[in-house]
């Protein structure tokens, strides 16, 4: 019989960073915000977080020619996944996004968000602003 590790794959993360919630050793946390209701006549930005994660798999984590450190290890980077939301429910999406960013900030990590459209800046700024008034 196969073990769970042999049967199930882990979610794609940014640059292969560990998946999970930020803790004491994490200085930064990736958060996807798959939202595109702030754009008119053109949807698709909600696919941004997944696309960025897929493309980041092509990046080398350490390249001594350009940088003498591994950003994932140096930052203790963790990928929290994406905010679970329904794109058509704008108020709910913003509330959930603000709560997700708030949890990252309260854990002492810097949120690195991958949108979505530009409107997701509003709930992100609200959450960060609560901590840094």
Task: Please provide the spans of the model-predicted regions.
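Metal-dependent C-N hydrolase catalytic cores
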Residues: 1-133
């Amino acid at each position: 019989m196969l073990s769970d590790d042999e049967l199930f794959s882990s979610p794609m993360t940014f640059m292969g960073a560990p998946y999970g919630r930020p803790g004491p050793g994490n200085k930064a946390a990736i958060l996807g915000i798959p939202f595109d209701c702030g754009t008119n006549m053109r949807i698709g930005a909600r696919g941004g977080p997944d696309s960025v994660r897929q493309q980041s798999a092509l990046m080398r984590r350490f390249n001594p020619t350009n940088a003498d450190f591994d950003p994932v290890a140096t930052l203790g980077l963790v990928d929290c996944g994406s905010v679970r939301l329904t794109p058509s429910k704008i108020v709910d999406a913003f509330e959930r996004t603000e709560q997700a960013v708030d949890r990252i900030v309260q854990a002492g990590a810097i949120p690195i968000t991958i949108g979505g459209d530009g409107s997701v800046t509003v709930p992100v700024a609200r959450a960060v602003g609560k901590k840094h008034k």
